[in-house]
Amino acid sequence: MNILFVGDVVGQTSGDYLCSRLPKIKRDYSVDLTIVNGENSADGNGITPFSANLLLNGGADIITTGNHSFRRREMNDMYEESDVIIRPANFGDTYGKGYCVFDMGRTRVAVINLLGMAYMDNCDNPFHFVDKILKEIDTPNIIVDFHAEATSEKKAMGYYLEGRVSAVLGTHTHVQTNDEEILGGHTGYITDVGMTGAKRSVLGVDKDVIIARLTTYYPQKHTYPEGDIMINAVVLSIDEKNGRCTEIKKINM
């Protein structure tokens, strides 16, 4: 089976654009399941019920998030009610779930969301936490969205889960890396999938806003520029009988 994983969606305009392109991407890559990181899909940061529904109605099967999961209080009920919108599992005992198991009929796919420790909000140890979760999952097809800042921590998680999960996909930094590989002949890996956001921007945010923040030291409201939008993603080919990743392809369009 082929699984599409789309990097952090930044802002509503980027979400709209992604949804307009998803049908063709799915056809071109024969996609069976689509996972989207939507933690910044709302204008002004975070995720809202509106931006989440936009992605789900536009073709996402599962939405993962990250350190901005709870930036918007209006999402709390949706985290509780939804089986396909997840937040980092090691983010404490709070609203929602840290993993889901998606029933595709012929097989099931588990998706785990984890938050890194380095340079991030306080959270439980993701290495210890993922061990607990894996004991609860009874499918070999397992995708891990590791939302983390440090490359070293992401690489370590890749090796830690080598042979135990189908893929470890880094998110959060919004810059697609050039190190996709299959670890141990089993686990697809990339340090960062990248983002879906404005090309002429600073990590999806209006460049003038970020420059003003860095030169004046005053807080700035995040706004999102108009113009061309890029989509960063990966497509995983997985043997659904044993969960082994046989190919990982980057998308940068």
Task: State the predicted function of each range.
Residues M1-M253:
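Acidic, metal/ion-coordinating pockets
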